[in-house]
Amino acid sequence: MSDANNRRGAGKGLLGRCADFLDDRTGYRALVHEALFERVPGGARWRYVWGSTLVFAFMTQVITGLFLWASYAPSAQTAWESVYYIQHEMTGGWLLRGIHHFMAQAMVVLLALHLLQVVIDGAYKAPREVNFWLGLVLMMLVLGMALTGYLLPWDQKGYWATIVATNLAGIVPFAGPSLQQLVVGGPDYGHHTLTRFFALHAGFLPATLVLFLVVHLALFRKHGLHARQPITRPDAMFWPDQVLKDAVAMLAVMAVVLGVILVPAVRTMLAGGQVDWGHVGAELGAPADPSESYAAARPEWYFLFLFQFLKVFEGWGATGEFLGAIVVPGLIMVVMFLMPIIGNWRLGHRFNVAFTFGIVAGAGLLTALALNEDYCSLWIDKESLADAEKLHDEAGGDEAKIAAALGHDPAKISAMRKKLARLEAYRNSQAFLAASRQAESDAARAVELAGRPERIPPTGALDLVRHDPLSRGPRLFGLREGKDCASCHAHVDPRSAEAAAQLAAASAPNLHGFGTVGWVRGLLD
């Protein structure tokens, strides 16, 4: 060690000398100083925290994802089973999975806030155009990770929602069918679909995101923060004020995520109930079953806007799907990539701000409409639709008969059409809610079967569910769909309130209590 270094280390403790040793060989102090003592135009502001919270959320996803990976088995016969193990048996697995699940949703919200802040502040203008384009690429990568992660539990909800999403890939002109087969891994959905989605979710997309993120941050360091004009406050350093604001925002994001996970459990405890921690956090549906349709299939809430938007083109067939799923979203992304150029026009920045707010507001409105369609029966007064329901059923839905029953009065016909539309919305909502309740029941039964002393057989949880008399019996009988045996036979306790209506509609014996002494006596009477 040189005399200068000896003098510098004189009087320092072991940690100080170790720090000097590392600094001599790495120069880390200069790097830390450059990172922390960057000038912030106009001083620290809360509006600058969104980029940092996004990086924090992504790092949380990486850490929790690696721990989940250690216990996850990506195959059609072991995926659901390994997620069941994580959720219900691994110590703290429910919390780990809950943080990963809800932090992914938080990232989508943070993306929207960060995009709004960048556009409002004009941080896409020269010389930051390339960094803005990189940000848009990062946004698409995050959404891709959210989409591919949906299938990995290999439950009914993720399986059927993924089928809808991948079918959209098939409508791309020329390359659509080949692209769909490439993503799915063959002509049918199965093991190769799952392994490809897992490779995308845990390997290719995160690695690509890290690469683009490094370049994004490097360009951000090169150009510095862009402050809204005019600047009314003096500049300050990144440390300590902006670092403190960023840290508070990160803690707030984690607090919200933990709150979403834990609040239901806290409510149960306050009510004096027993908390089953395996049912806290991210849900786990019944094992994916290609032979069983799933009427409650929906994308996650942040993709509901696209699901609802496609309904605008419902009557247009394949052309409508192509316009709604490919053309319109593609044009929106083109406009966003052109924002740095548009911003140079006289009113370009105002157009960019208005366009971005319009997209966010439109997505919010479409999401609200989708939720309203699914849950409107909870607040629609069915009694107010009684006359419309009676008329519709008597006329068999025939508009000519309905018009005749109303005396061909235009005002009455118009009013009745509105009521019939509400009636249809009510019935569709009821069907969705019934399917959701059935899905919850099936999921609870699957978890109950998997937790029995016999455990999950080598053939997998789906085989366990398929051989369960309690859940398969009603399906075979046709109780849920009103078909098969249930199309003729009733299955209702004769003493119940609804017995009279069901027995009157039945054309064959009531099979409630089949094989019991009471049933045989009733048959012989």
Residue ranges of predicted features:
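Membrane-embedded alpha-helical bundles of multi-pass integral membrane proteins
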Residues: 38-47, 52-70, 82-100, 113-387
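Alpha-helical transmembrane signal-anchor/signal-peptide segments
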Residues: 272-274, 375-396, 400, 411-446
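Membrane-proximal N-terminal segments immediately preceding the first transmembrane helix
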Residues: 25-39
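Electrostatic cytochrome c docking/interface patches
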Residues: 398-408, 426, 440-480
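Short, non-transmembrane cytosolic segments of multipass membrane proteins
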Residues: 1-22
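Periplasmic/extracellular electron-transfer cofactor-ligation site
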Residues: 474-508
